[in-house]
Amino acid sequence: IREYNKDAAEKLKGYSRDDFSEIYLFFDYDGHNCNLSATDPDGTAVLGEMLETFDNETELGKLYINYPMVEAIRDNKKEDCCYRRCSVSLEEAGKYKNIVSDMKEFQDFRKYTYEDWQYLCQQAIKKANCIVQGKYETVSYKELFQYLSQQDIYQSQQKNFVSKGEIAILSSVPLFLLEYFPGTFYEKILERALC
């Protein structure tokens, strides 16, 4: 990072690789990015390779992908149980930031309450399960990481959505929280169904 970014080099001054036990990477599946276009097989192959390479936070790092971008966390409404906007076209993905700017409920993540995060985590579990297994429902903690890994989500996105010119909307931030914290956090998240 220091080699490519002067600001990062300054902030990381005095730190060595051994000072970091875990590395998490967040990446937007940005269909309008000309370097890694969602419609270009080479671009999507690169993302698949990245997921294979960055699959462990204690080694090279763990990669999480937002579909289509980090703003997906804003694209929620508490009264919508079965997610009203499941996907966007790859053409719309480039304008997605503007599309969700009108959503008022989850605009400022700094103001999210515990109940908000509980709802967002529940939604993310159900959405990920819907993308991978076609079922909008929660799964056990074990199943979450056995069947709904970042690689599973990516492959299902390619097969079921991108191949049809769409991308299923999913924020990886709640999935990261569920994986980062132990199973007791998962149990607390699911103890009160908000949807």
Task: For every predicted segment, state its role.
Residues 7-195:
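C-terminal accessory helical subdomains adjacent to catalytic cores in phosphodiester-
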Residues 1-6:
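Domain-level signal for Mg2+-assisted phosphodiester chemistry and nucleotide/NA-binding surfaces
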